């Protein structure tokens, strides 16, 4: 049962990747770029150039999809992008995941019942910090009670702003939400991702994150171009502990490419373990993201959200690099999937720490530091939406 479930889970993911990469929005009319920031336009032009096409190509990868949905004034194109992303693997083709989902549900139910549990959730939660289904429902209901009034208020504000801009007959649709919530955020806080992007040059962010790791844990990173990598975009670093001893190999794989899964994650190519001779075999870990690639005119520039993503996945990589156990199956991130998020969520909190931002957040053209007033606006806007 578990083997079949594993194979179906893998097939599910492969189908999603296939559908994700199959879609592109090819624009040749420059007027259809209205509202988009220069960084998104330049990245789309680069995509088209790499495919030997004229114009601009937008994809369902987050660095392309997110700014399009947030800034594009072309409502019908937003709808097209939204529907493409949110109907993946539901079409009448060989990538449809409906039957896979049905089979997985039945397999999990059968597995749980064979082991004496009422549901698969009961089986899984037996070894999680929540312990049981009742505790999960209690937490969810507590969160709903705490946040629902604010959520209703903010959604109403977004709808009112949209009607103010478009007329009283305007009806909000899912593909409008990012666009108008951004408008409301600008109205409330005068802040958006593109205002911050020039201060978050990827190379500087890397230096800042490595410097933070050195300050907190005493470890150092040294790029080693002799280490074999699996793609030219990937960089490899040797990591050394505070006493100078070898700790790990760290791979940085930051940019989208054909066939690469969307999103961000940390993975291990080699886990830590103690071999039969007593040697401490050190781990090889990788942080994988899909940040906007550099162009001929600009270096890779991140949003604050992407800085936070980097810190989150870097937290996972630290979990892997600091591993020191006998068995590889128990080392690093090979822990229950609720606790595994603790190091990552701890690290991502540094994204809005002033002292951390001051170590690397400088305008890529002028060298000016990120203004304190912008940092204050960031903090104030954190609880919005």
Labelled PLM ranges:
Residues 3-59, 102, 107, 113-293, ...:
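Active-site-proximal, well-structured secondary-structure segments within enzyme catalytic domains
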Residues 62, 85, 291-295:
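Short, histidine-centered active-site or binding-site loop motifs used for metal coordination
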Residues 64-68, 89-94, 125-136:
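Second-shell loop/turn segments in exported
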Residues 71-89:
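Short, charge-rich amphipathic alpha-helices with coiled-coil/heptad character
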Residues 83-102:
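A short, flexible low-complexity segment enriched in Lys/Arg and Gly/Pro that occurs
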Residues 109-112, 116, 213, 293, ...:
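Active-site recognition of the HExxH zinc-binding catalytic motif
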Residues 309, 313, 317-350:
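Zinc-dependent metallopeptidase catalytic helix centered on the HExxH motif
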């Amino acid at each position: 049962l578990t083997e079949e479930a594993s194979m179906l889970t893998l097939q599910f993911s492969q189908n999603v990747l296939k559908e994700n990469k199959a879609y592109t929005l090819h624009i040749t009319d420059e007027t259809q770029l209205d509202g988009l920031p220069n960084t998104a336009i330049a990245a789309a032009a680069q995509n088209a150039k790499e495919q030997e096409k004229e114009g601009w190509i937008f994809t369902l990868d987050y660095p392309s999809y997110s700014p399009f949905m947030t800034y594009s004034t072309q409502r019908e194109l937003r709808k097209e992008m939204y529907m493409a992303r949110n109907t993946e693997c539901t079409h009448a083709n060989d990538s449809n995941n409906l039957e896979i989902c049905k089979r997985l549900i039945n397999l999990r139910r059968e597995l749980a019942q064979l082991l004496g549990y009422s549901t698969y959730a009961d089986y899984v939660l037996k070894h999680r910090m929540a312990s049981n289904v009742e505790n999960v429902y209690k937490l969810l209901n507590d969160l709903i009670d705490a946040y629902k009034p604010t959520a209703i208020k903010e959604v109403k504000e977004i709808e009112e702003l949209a009607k103010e801009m478009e007329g009283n007959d305007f009806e909000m649709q899912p593909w409008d939400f990012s666009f108008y919530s951004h408008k409301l955020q600008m109205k409330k806080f005068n802040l958006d991702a593109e205002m911050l992007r020039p201060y978050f040059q990827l190379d500087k962010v890397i230096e800042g994150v490595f410097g933070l790791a050195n300050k907190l844990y005493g470890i150092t990173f040294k790029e080693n171009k002799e280490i074999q990598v699996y793609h030219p975009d990937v960089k490899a670093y040797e990591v050394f502990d505070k006493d100078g001893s070898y700790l790990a190999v760290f791979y940085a794989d930051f940019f989208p490419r054909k066939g690469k899964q969307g999103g961000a994650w940390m993975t291990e190519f080699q886990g830590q373990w103690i071999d039969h001779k007593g040697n401490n075999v050190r781990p090889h870990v990788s942080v994988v993201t899909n940040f906007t690639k550099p162009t001929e005119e600009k270096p890779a520039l991140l949003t604050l959200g992407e800085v936070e993503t980097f810190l989150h996945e870097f937290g996972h990589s630290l979990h892997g690099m600091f591993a020191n156990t006998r068995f590889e199956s128990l080392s690093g991130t090979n822990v229950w999937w609720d606790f595994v998020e603790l190091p990552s969520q701890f690290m991502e909190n540094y994204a809005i720490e002033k002292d951390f931002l001051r170590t690397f957040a400088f305008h890529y053209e002028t060298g000016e530091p990120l203004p304190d007033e912008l940092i204050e606006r960031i903090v104030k806007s954190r609880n919005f939406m």
